[in-house]
Amino acid sequence: MKYMITSKGDEKSDLLRLNMIAGFGEYDMEYDDVEPEIVISIGGDGTFLSAFHQYEERLDEIAFIGIHTGHLGFYADWRPAEANKLVKLVAKGEYQKVSYPLLKTTVKYGIGKKEATYLALNESTVKSSGGPFVVDVVINDIHFERFRGDGLCMSTPSGTTAYNKSLGGALMHPSIEAMQLTEMASINNRVYRTIGSPLVFPKHHVVSLQPVNDKDFQISVDHLSILHRDVQEIRYEVSAKKIHFARFKSFPFWRRVHDSFIED
């Protein structure tokens, strides 16, 4: 079996990575960072997100594993003390694949520029590049509202525990193939109105954000943020692709939520 291990880059994570590579050397395991079947991330959720985007073109062939060397993460649920046990389990291939939905973001530009497509594990946000943020929100080709405010956030089910939560969005179980739209400081008065609530969209629904005046936007996809100019439309939908995790033990999603936000 081919595997690779990525590290946060701190001393603790780097040392653990080297120890695990040495451990895998005792088994029929091949280190391959080009076409791995198992990707192990050591660090936190940020390190895991980087590993995900590094291999997002090969998601069907990869199972991911996360080891946290800091606080418990939603994607990094193994502890450093369990590394030797994990090496043995991976080498024996004793795991099940668990899949989570992803978010597809398509940015369309003016004439002459090719559209750009992105994949998110957590969320995508849209903000103005400087002026007022005003967009028309269109759901399945039907105009829903004209939004004015700081911005909008579309998240995956697993991503609802991240930025979405701080915006007052609901937490969604990753078994639900859906996406959630939350507002950032919307303007609501006698003249301007928005729905003022998070919106959850099922698979096959398409949400389109269409500029009203300014066509330059700061668009983020997970930890990547880029200024896009001459934007004509931003489309969100549940991706046909999924991320696969190698699961060796039961760690229910709601237990993860409890340990992260209530008590560990």
UniProtKB/Swiss-Prot annotation:
Reaction(s) catalysed by this chain's protein: NAD(+) + ATP = ADP + NADP(+) + H(+)
Function: Involved in the regulation of the intracellular balance of NAD and NADP, and is a key enzyme in the biosynthesis of NADP. Catalyzes specifically the phosphorylation on 2'-hydroxyl of the adenosine moiety of NAD to yield NADP.
Keyword check for Ion transport: no
SUPFAM superfamilies associated with the record: NAD kinase/diacylglycerol kinase-like
Entry protein name: NAD kinase 1
PANTHER family given in the database record: NAD KINASE
Family stated for the protein in its record: Belongs to the NAD kinase family.
Record keywords: ATP-binding, Cytoplasm, Kinase, NAD, NADP, Nucleotide-binding, Transferase
Active site: 45 (proton acceptor)
GO cellular component terms, semicolon-separated: cytoplasm
GO annotation, biological process: NAD metabolic process; NADP biosynthetic process
